Design a protein with these regions (language model features):
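PP2C/PPM-type serine/threonine phosphatase catalytic domain
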Residues: 1-146
């Protein structure tokens, strides 16, 4: 199976594309950097996807453990870069950090996938047999949940 992923940024001039996507043999994922708060959202999005585990994240505890294992090198590099940018950027980084949503789908076999999402990014799956479009949110009302 051949995979392809592309993230198209907003057309405004000077607008940073804060989103990241991957499509590999057994995983597809999207991370939507939330640039309205914090710094380096585009970096955090890419970092999350580049450090996804090979096996599915199945619980909040597993998500916390995974983030706990990967965050420090990212933080240290961004802290250094914010320091170079100056005091206001460093203060903003300390106060707000970086934000991004995440949705990932792991292919477990030819007939089974497992997905997880954090935030409001959504994975869609079209079931050819049932002709139903499935998604990682149960209902549209789920978007109103914190």
């Amino acid at each position: 199976m051949r995979s392809f992923a592309n993230s198209i940024g907003k057309p405004e001039q000077g607008c940073i594309n804060e989103d990241a996507v991957i499509a590999q043999e057994n995983i597809i994922a999207v991370s939507d950097g939330a640039g309205g708060g914090g710094l380096f959202a585009e970096r955090w999005s890419a970092y999350l996807l580049n450090h996804l585990p090979a096996t599915p994240i199945s619980s909040a505890d597993e998500l916390d453990a995974w983030i706990g294992d990967i965050w420090e090198p990212y933080y240290n590099q961004c802290e250094t870069d914010a320091r170079i940018l100056g005091g206001l950027s460093l203060d903003k980084f300390y106060d707000e950090g970086s934000f991004a949503t995440l949705v990932a789908v792991w292919r477990l076999s030819d007939t089974e996938c497992q997905w997880m999402s954090f935030g409001d990014s959504v994975a869609f799956h079209y079931n050819y047999r049932t002709k139903q479009l499935e998604h990682s949110f149960g209902t549209l009302a789920d978007f109103d949940k914190p």
